[in-house]
Amino acid sequence: MAKSARTKTARPATRTETDSFGPIEVPSDRYWGAQTERSRQNFRIGTDRMPISLVHALGIVKLAAAQSNRELGLLDQRRASAIIRAAREVIDGSLDDHFPLVVWQTGSGTQTNMNLNEVIANRANELLGGELGAKKPVHPNDHVNMSQSSNDSFPTAMHIAAASRITADLVPALGELLRALRKKEKEFAKIVKIGRTHTQDATPLTLGQEFSGYAAQVESGIARLKVAVKELYPLAQGGTAVGTGLNAKPRFARLFAKHVAGITKLPFTSAANKFEALASNDAYVLAHGAISSVATGLFKIANDIRLLGSGPRSGLGELILPENEPGSSIMPGKVNPTQCEAMTMVCCQVFGNHTAITVAGSQGHFELNVYKPVLAYNMLHSIRLMADAARSFTEHCVSGIRADEKRISELMQRSLMLVTALAPKIGYDNAAKVAKTAHANGTTLKEEALRLGFVTADEFDRLVQPEKMTKPG
């Protein structure tokens, strides 16, 4: 009896949803509908899900659209309130499990847009006491997608997601790295070391000056991101299918952008030309270019730090890097610059993502670019990777870097390029002769300068002072 009772009350595994192709069975514990299920079955390609930050951004699109349509008198209060509540649940992540689609689908993102429409409609109907799959009182197309097309909604969400994540994640993470580098700049301000150009010895500088260069690179990268993100503020919404605005009221686009700005606290606007906003993704390519330029700088910084920390006994050994974990399965006691390696691998991935974005961005055939999912995926992938890598690099590497002052001094005193300080006194050719002779004989610069009769001991000591060589003059 008990078993029979449980069988009667158990929820069926599936329910029937319909679209223009007819009925299809959908998991009963999920809010998505027929079009999402067809995409799920037709595009079993890889495991790369549509980024959840893009899904949340589409939730913002649906929320702002419902608010705008309500204000325009197109959507009644009852339906609007239910859609708005369901959209907020999408935005806050409560419904993340209901967005199963992969990146590799229609190039307009239509199936993901319909995934949002179906989930929000079913959830709204549930809130209103309706049945899942009934499409009433809230219809996924007629109400949730009102005044919209996938062709303007998806690129709008792309801009919202990228601008939001750059602002909230990447820029703050780089700010943490910048502060750590500035701290090291001050800490190392009085440590004089030999400089290197072409990987060969050059004139001295302070370790603080070297780190000031790294800090300036990060600071400039942040500044470029803040400029580039402005390119993402104009939104395609209101262009509908091809940019004409068919089926959207003339006031809709500006009203929508105002609501998005209010929701995100970012200055989004309505794009001046909707044809460009649908057919091209030039702003996306530019914005990712700024991210790629940051990766270029971080690759250089991480590479320098791991080389300066090479050793511990047979490398440059000027820096002592934090020891976070064992480095070898065969060599006992070995510790590797793993944070530098992770950072440079992330940078390589970002460079690859930029190539994909550049190629995809060039594919705006006629009135619509149909490579939008791969554009969004690579952009958001880069932002996430760069932000995470910057935080990891800061916490587990940069903040714990120490200088081996004894090793730094030893290498500096052995450098032949200190001879540069003699050039104004004895001339370039004679200074070069001192350096070459000292190198050939295995002697010091001072010994050869005195032997050749170019300067006295007092003159050499007065002219060759590494700490004075770190400043103009």
Curated annotation (Swiss-Prot):
The record's GO molecular-function terms, alphabetically, read: fumarate hydratase activity
The EC number(s) this enzyme carries:
4.2.1.2
The record's listing under SUPFAM superfamilies reads:
L-aspartase-like
Its cellular-component GO annotations read: cytoplasm
Which keywords describe this protein according to UniProt?
Cytoplasm, Lyase, Tricarboxylic acid cycle
Which residues act catalytically here?
A: H198, S328
Gene3D superfamilies for this protein: Fumarase/aspartase (C-terminal domain), Fumarase/aspartase (Central domain), Fumarase/aspartase (N-terminal domain)
Which top class of enzyme applies to this chain? lyase
Q: Where is this site: Important for catalytic activity?
A: E341
Q: Which InterPro entries match?
A: Fum_hydII, Fumarase/histidase_N, Fumarase_C_C, Fumarate_lyase_CS, Fumarate_lyase_fam, Fumarate_lyase_N, L-Aspartase-like
Which Pfam families has this protein been placed in?
A: FumaraseC_C, Lyase_1
- Record has Transferase as a keyword: no
Q: Report the locations given in the UniProt record.
A: Cytoplasm
PROSITE patterns assigned: FUMARATE_LYASES (PS00163)
Name the positions where substrate binds. 108-110, 139-142, 149-151, 197, 329, 334-336
Q: Give GO BP annotations, semicolon-separated.
A: fumarate metabolic process; malate metabolic process; tricarboxylic acid cycle
Quick one: where's region Disordered? Answer: 1-28
Q: Which family does it belong to?
A: Belongs to the class-II fumarase/aspartase family. Fumarase subfamily.
Q: What does this protein do?
A: Involved in the TCA cycle. Catalyzes the stereospecific interconversion of fumarate to L-malate.
How is this protein organized at the quaternary level?
A: Homotetramer.
- Relay the record's extra comment: There are 2 substrate-binding sites: the catalytic A site, and the non-catalytic B site that may play a role in the transfer of substrate or product between the active site and the solvent. Alternatively, the B site may bind allosteric effectors.
What is the official name of this protein in its record? Fumarate hydratase class II 2
